[in-house]
């Protein structure tokens, strides 16, 4: 227990990382076996569903860029960075360059950058005090600790912009297309409407969206005669027909078609950027609600009892997200995978700013608290030891959510 406590204290409160000395042979063997297992799983995943593999690679790249954000801003602000690793657990491969040790660890569950002097618990060599995180100004601390989430937001913005300007944005096209017609005897059959026709007007009401078409029809009564204008192969036609009663709602008028008016619409680069900003901001709002939902353990408990009751509130892990990515790839292609990846980046960026350790938001909250408590040139130092019990509870909650999510993703995929 004492060993676990010390590891928690060192790696999660002080800032991650492990001793740099060479691992013993058993640890090295474990690392090699773990790495081979992970490599085998990735190869299998590539054969099983290439889109899922692409999504997983995108997630790993996102994690790498997250740490690049911390690393680059720490170096830029004069902090000392001693480690940069992809993955956790036993080391698979590492190199040293100057004061920096970098490499890959066996478990691809994230990454970390080790910055000296994250708080008063971190022992710092006397010669490194000037370069310690804790001795830098508050703006520099805040920049470094939030740079990871900032990278997620920038990546999401870039993906949204790229997809909108190349493949298009899911939006109103300005045309209402007939998707299919109903059973024989409907007004649509009397008009001769076919799949692929475009409805342009109901009476005097011009329609350019599905909602406008529904409004134009339901604002009339069954038995009303109306002129319906539609276009086929570039030729416009207008015919008169009597609206029927909706089989499910006899008081509502009924034409007898299903329609859609949305599709992927390519935008100019400038317009794409504008829409990317709007959609990123909207995703931030949705992600805040999602974080609150995800961190509520009652949602996980209810999901374990009844997985299909409310899929929107059940915990989802990388496994579930990757499954969704594979499904989107098969139905929507590359754009579907990329748009999901952008949304996930926004969520991770928001989630990581949760103001408790071990999240980056916890370090940002501590830096802000210290800044507010500092007076007359005297720097206040928060006692991070007091946060360890809270951090332990948070880690316990995260572990529960992780295992609950994994169980649901494997036994009852979305």
Where would I find each of the regions flagged by the language model?
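Small-residue-rich helix-interface/hinge motifs
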Residues: 2-18, 50-127, 351-375
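Functional transmembrane alpha-helices
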Residues: 5-30, 131-132, 136, 246-348, ...
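Hydrophobic core of alpha-helical transmembrane segments in multi-pass integral membrane proteins
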Residues: 28-45, 402
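Final/C-terminal transmembrane alpha-helix of multipass membrane proteins
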Residues: 40, 387-409
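Aromatic-capped interface at the extracytoplasmic side
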Residues: 46-56, 159-175, 410-413
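Internal alpha-helical transmembrane segments
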Residues: 76, 109-177, 389-393
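Conserved PDZ fold ligand-binding element
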Residues: 179, 188-211, 280
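PDZ-domain C-terminal substructure recognizer with occasional recognition of PDZ-binding tails
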Residues: 194, 200-201, 214-258
């Amino acid at each position: 227990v004492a060993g676990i406590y010390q590891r928690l204290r060192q790696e999660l409160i002080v800032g991650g990382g492990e001793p740099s000395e060479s691992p013993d042979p058993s640890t090295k063997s474990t690392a090699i076996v773990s790495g081979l297992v992970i490599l085998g799983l990735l190869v299998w995943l590539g054969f099983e569903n290439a889109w899922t593999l692409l999504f997983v690679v995108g997630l790993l790249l996102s994690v790498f860029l997250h740490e690049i954000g911390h690393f680059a801003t720490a170096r830029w602000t004069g902090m000392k960075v001693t480690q940069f690793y992809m993955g956790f657990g036993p080391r698979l491969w590492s190199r040293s360059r100057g004061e920096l040790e970098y490499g890959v660890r066996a478990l691809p569950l994230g990454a970390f950058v080790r910055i000296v002097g994250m708080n008063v618990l971190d022992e710092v060599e006397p010669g490194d005090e000037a370069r310690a995180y804790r001795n830098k100004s508050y703006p520099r601390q805040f920049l470094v600790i939030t740079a990871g989430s900032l990278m997620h937001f920038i990546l999401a913005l870039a993906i949204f912009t790229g997809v909108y300007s190349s493949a298009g944005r899911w939006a109103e096209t300005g045309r209402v297309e007939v998707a299919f017609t109903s059973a024989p005897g409907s007004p649509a059959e009397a008009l001769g409407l076919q799949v692929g026709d475009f409805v342009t007007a109901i009476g005097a009401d011009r329609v350019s969206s599905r909602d406008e078409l529904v409004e134009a029809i339901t604002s009339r009564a069954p038995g009303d005669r109306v002129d319906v204008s539609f276009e086929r192969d570039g030729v416009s036609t207008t015919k008169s027909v009597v609206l029927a009663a909706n089989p499910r709602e006899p008081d509502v008028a009924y034409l007898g078609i299903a329609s859609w008016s949305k599709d992927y619409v390519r935008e100019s680069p400038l317009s794409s950027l504008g829409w990317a900003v709007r959609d990123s901001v909207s995703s931030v709002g949705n992600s805040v609600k999602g974080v609150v939902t995800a961190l509520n353990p009652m949602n996980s408990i209810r999901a374990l009892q009844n997985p299909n009751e409310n899929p929107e509130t059940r915990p989802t892990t990388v496994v579930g997200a990757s499954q969704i990515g594979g499904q989107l790839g098969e139905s929507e292609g590359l754009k579907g995978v990329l748009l999901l990846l952008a949304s996930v980046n926004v969520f991770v960026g928001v989630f990581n700013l949760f103001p408790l350790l071990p999240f980056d938001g916890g370090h940002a909250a501590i830096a802000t608290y210290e800044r507010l408590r500092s007076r007359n040139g005297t720097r206040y130092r928060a006692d991070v030891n007091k946060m360890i019990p809270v951090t332990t509870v948070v880690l316990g909650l995260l572990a529960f959510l992780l295992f609950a999510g994994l169980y649901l993703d494997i036994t009852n995929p979305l």
